[in-house]
Amino acid sequence: MADGDIEIKAGFVDTDLDDRKLTMIDDLNNPLAIVERVYLIWWHWADFHLHVISPHIDTITPAIVIEPELISGSNDHEFVYSIHDSGSKLSTSKSQDMFSAGMSMCKLFYTIEKMVHILVDRLKSGGVSMEEEVQIAFAGHEIAQRKAFESIINLPYNVVVTNFDPGIWGEKYLQNVKRLADKGYGYPPESPRENYKHPVSSATTARK
């Protein structure tokens, strides 16, 4: 009986392996499955780029790397990724945390808030008025672009994103904003925001 049991179990194992091989082959031949997996990988190291088209901003070569700064009054650094500053272009990505961050976009969103803050500081130092039209363009992961768009439309400056169509997502976003406002929760805070300067360790301790 014991030998028979072993043979049966071995047969199950062989069948299971064969099924998995067939599934794997089907996935490799399925364009949609491949696209889905590539998108999932991209989500883990999502990047974002902000280009200033107009007004003209001088290019910085080589790019300056802006590291997370120490937050005043604490031992924590800003909860952001490194930002590569090329003058007219700001770039960042989750690549340094791709294995630990997983699909979380929290740190990237805070980094985007800082990039928008840098953009505004650059406009102020360049003497650009709030009424003057500023044209920018996005590149990178779709979710990161949506976050940047949300921050940009809440700026007091006349900033226009030339290559981003909010589409159905934009309509739903505005509907949700209005619904929350009608319930008394107010509207999103004006940009630029400094929420990325919130000490991470103290927030974690408070939750515990």
Swiss-Prot record:
Entry GO terms, CC: cytoplasm
Q: Where is this region: Disordered?
A: 184-208
Look up keyword Ribonucleoprotein and say if it applies.
Answer: no
- Is the keyword Transport in the record? yes
Indicate where this protein resides in the cell.
Cytoplasm
Annotated knockout phenotype = Shows attenuated virulence in guinea pigs. Mutant invades alveolar macrophages normally, but shows slower growth than wild-type strain. The mutant is twofold more susceptible to killing by human beta-defensin 2 but not to killing by other cationic peptides, serum complement, or polymorphonuclear neutrophils.
Q: Which UniProt keywords apply?
A: Cytoplasm, Protein transport, Transport, Virulence
Principal subcellular localization? cytoplasm
Query: From its record, what is one biological process in GO terms?
Result: protein transport
What is its biological role? Answer: Component of the Dot/Icm type IVB secretion system (T4BSS), which is used to inject bacterial effector proteins into eukaryotic host cells. Part of a subcomplex which recruits effector proteins and delivers them to the core transmembrane subcomplex. Is a critical subunit for binding a subset of effector proteins. Recognizes more than one type of binding motif. May be a critical factor that confers host specificity. Necessary for full virulence of the bacterium in guinea pigs and presumably humans.
Protein name (Swiss-Prot/TrEMBL): Type 4 adapter protein LvgA
Classification lineage: Bacteria, Pseudomonadati, Pseudomonadota, Gammaproteobacteria, Legionellales
Which gene underlies this protein? lvgA
